[in-house]
Amino acid sequence: MRTVRRRELLGAAGAALALAAGTRARRAFGAEPVDLALVLAADVSRSINDDEFQLQRNGYAAAITSAAVLNAIGQGERRAIALCYNEWAGEGEEKVLLDWAVLRDKDSAQAFADKLLAQPRAYLGRTAIGSAIEFSMNLLAESGFDAPRHVIDVSGDGTSNQGDEVTATRDAAVAAGTTINGLAIFNKRAAALGGYLAAHTNPPGGIAKYYQTNVIGGPGAFVEQIDDFNSFGEAMIRKLVSEIACAEPAGDGAKAG
């Protein structure tokens, strides 16, 4: 992983300032009001095989359309959230699969999920978490919604091994008032292969600890951990409900330390 230079840090800081300024401007000029602007940033790096990827993708779709998530949206003051979905892998491998959409009911959630399931996998590369965060920050800056809360929801199964320094981009996002939460997946299959993959997917203290220390941050930030991709959908439901309601995670969640 390369070191972030001063120019890059200034770029991240500039994105943070633009995000904060853009939020104020949208509120001033009557942009569409929502309770939350949420970016789902999904790891599709090569440590995730095709079967695991499909479980992850299906889990996102199931969570978005779940009764629990729809109920959480309906309980908000504005009864709507803005949602954007991107997939990422190595540096420069970030792609918006579904641009911003407002979810306020079953039909809008189902339409989003159906479009998501129809998209092919974006990448199969390395793991650049910092670059994914910066990419997601830019999406928030350009979102065009009046949202009192901005959240980046990062899912992944390994440590960052390429691209921007994770903590630097995390700190820039937090400085802009953005919360970054994590869904850390312990990929037992990849870890059992040994060598680099074992170290990548099971770092000292575990992948959830890595996310807690390096990735998440901001008001109410937390990381949820799962031990296989089969439980991805259930974990994402818990995570989305907590993010939408701005509440404590109900499952195996750990706060930013």
Model-inferred region functions:
Residues 41-51, 116-126, 156-160, 198, ...:
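Second-shell loop/turn segments in exported
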Residues 159-210:
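VWA/integrin I-like adhesion module and closely mimicked acidic/polar interface patches used
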Residues 2-3, 8-27:
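N-terminal export signals
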Residues 76-115, 195-204, 208, 212:
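Short beta-strand-loop
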